[in-house]
Amino acid sequence: YKKEIFRDLDKKYNSHLYSGLLGILMKYCHRKLEIYKNKKDNYDKILEIGAGSAPHFNFMKCSYNEYHIAETSDYAEDFHKNNPKVKLLKYDGRNLPYQNETFDRIIISHCLEHILSPEEFIQEMMSKLKKGGVLSISLPTDPGIAWRLGRLFIRLFTIKKTYQISGEEFNYMNATEHVNSIFNLVSIIRFNYKNQYEEHF
């Protein structure tokens, strides 16, 4: 049943996520991830995980030599196949198929809430990061008042038009996809990594 609901939704999801008020908020999140970066910050290799159509690519302030994307969806693979600026590799959502200490920076935006074993996956990401490298994480405020109000608005006014699914199916999608709360994820990160900078927006 879940596969039936998600069939052919990837493209609609990406276009909807970056349009209207929701799009403004998502773009703001991407800008904030780059707030302390500039062209003087050069990274040889950057990896973005769960990039979808890679909207963060357009907000990059730092310079780099290679931009890699690790994705699980067929839509992303098809979307980037003719893009010479990125190197996309499809993976199983658990094991990153790269050698240890490969990347100078790893970006993961609004993805950890979807992963069943987030602590293990964070350790997997860290193993691919070079010593002294940067791991940039963006998390949604789910649960949270603003998040819940936004979700209610989408369910009541846009979900049928955008996805052609019911409000109940939309709630089911979110329940099965957002398996980690931000409170749990932040606690895991704070406990394991003391040398980190945290900003709320």
PLM region spans:
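Residues at the starts of beta-strands that form the adenosine-phosphate
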Residues: 45, 65-66, 134
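Conserved alpha-helix/loop element of class I SAM-dependent methyltransferases that forms part
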Residues: 23-43
